[in-house]
Amino acid sequence: MAAYVSTEDKPLGDNLPNKAVFQSYIWTCAKYDFNVYEKRIIYRLVEFAQRWLEGVRIKDHMHKVEPTNCGVNITMPVADILRDEDDHNYTKAKAAFTSLSKKGATYEDDNIWFYTAIIEHPKIEKNTGIAIFHVYEPVWRAALDFTKGYRKYELITAMKFKSVYSMRFYELLSGQIKPLYVPLEGPDGLRERFGLQTKYERVNDFKRKVLDIAKKELDEYSPYSFVAK
């Protein structure tokens, strides 16, 4: 599969400022299988990490980063991971925080391999709609590590996507000027990166369930897209 950048300008679809965030290439290339709500939690972590690096003090009581001996505690509104959605009794949020606390991410390059859990001890205060959870130190460190490069993308655009595969492609393609070739199979292939080693094993199924859906959303919301060959 080859992904080629499209540079045509497209409207964002709303009047909100589209804040740029810088995501460590470690996170961009990490191998994991998250759903959309879990991915939105990660996007918020990236946003928190950027503000931390910039030395921007978060002034409201609804957003906090509190260092601990083994990571950081994050406080944020549950609404930060929703897409203008109704979440009765926090059902979607509880499911997302619970499932993400049971998952991890893998990163590997020529020098290192590591696996880490992501978060633990998520809590939602029902009266205020505030979520509090702990982020493991390797995850926070990876979010702050730009030594291997970074991807710059627009946060509101990323939060628009309904498919997690659209999100992953958007991260990979954002800021890409030259054509980017990403194979389907292999250690750096899409199947491995997206954690789909046992799903959509037939190429046509992978194209229909992953590539076609991602391309449709990218064409609608993003200035970047790809073609599959």
Residue ranges of each PLM-predicted region?
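Charged, alpha-helix-forming regions
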Residues: 1-229
